[in-house]
Amino acid sequence: MEKLRLNVALLRKRVPNLTTAAKSVGLRPATVSNLSTGKIPVGRAEVRTIVALAELAGCTLDELILRGESVEMIETGIKILDLFAPIAKGGTVGLVARPGMGQLVVLAEMLHRLKMEGYKTILLNPKDNHPEMNDILDDVDFVANSIEETFNMMISAGVDKKFVLTADRAYVLSGEMYTLQEMLDDKDITEVTTFLLDLKGEAVDDDLPYGPLDTLWQFDADLAARHKYPAVNPIYSTSSILEGSYLDPVHHGVQQKAQKLLRRYRELRSIVTVHGVGRLPESELQVYKQGEKLEAYLTQPFYVAEPYTGKKGVTVGLKETLSDVKKILESSPSEFNAEDLQFIGKIES
């Protein structure tokens, strides 16, 4: 089957305020978001949806739909992200969270890890005063105060470099991120992976808070409240890389089974919270216990948090993550203990 995906970069460039534009032609912003991230494969989209998007972008269908192009994944060594919502190299990642869910810790960890991989890291300072951003400065190479300054820093560093750019949602809403994208396109600077965050916590109420994204990290209040970090929701977080035709079959199979288990586990957990575990039949109890183990395994110590947690940061390769998750999915009730799986790296044989 031919690989098809939306030209997300073109949509971002041509339709700055996609939420409003989509609604104006009768499209649900959530549908557009799911098509952009690959949660809904392009091949399964309604024809009228694709045509409407092409009309909004003022482009042909051939320009809107990319055929046969590969999407390269940046492996982070963070289990929950690499498994459920991997980063597309040169793509845009949107973080959706309310304050206190740990998005800045995840962002700081990403900057730390990518800097170690040779990326030049740039922070575009927020328009408003946000002293909490000081926490990520240790792993930022350059701090810019405007789009022009950001662009000039990239030019000075060299167009052949790999960049990571962090920016607040305000720059998306003002249209300045699209201006920067045009400037980068003019100079053929393509190795820019962007992290967008919403420091005001308003993005959670918007179906399409940043416009089209390659990767969405939806943070979870329940996980944060129970100190299951990183508190990234494995059900609602997604990536264009997860579109079946792009993904390694083993990764795709494990990801689908793990997500199915966690979805059911969350349903059962709501019952257990109210009525206790004794209310579950034996078959469901096994599912619940497996979900508990998997949720625990997906927690992970971060390098940037070492001074606060006293735990050494760990990196787990994707191959090891897939192998470990497969073991948990196939485990018997007596195998593994959820407490022993919490905040570890890989499962030691």
What does each model-identified segment do?
Residues M1-L18:
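A short, Lys/Arg-rich alpha-helix, primarily the initiator
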Residues E2-K3, R48-V51, E55, C59-G91, ...:
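P-loop NTPase nucleotide-binding/switch module
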Residues V15-L35:
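Short alpha-helical DNA-recognition segment
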Residues N17, E46-T49, G175-M177:
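Residues at alpha-helix caps and immediate loop-helix transition turns in enzyme cores, especially N-
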Residues R28-T31, E46, T60:
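Short coil turns linking two alpha-helices in DNA-binding domains
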Residues T37-V47:
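Short, solvent-exposed alpha-helical "recognition" segments
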Residues R44-A45, V51-A54, A305-Y308:
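Short, charged early-sequence alpha-helical segments and their helix-coil boundaries
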Residues D82-I347:
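P-loop NTPase catalytic core
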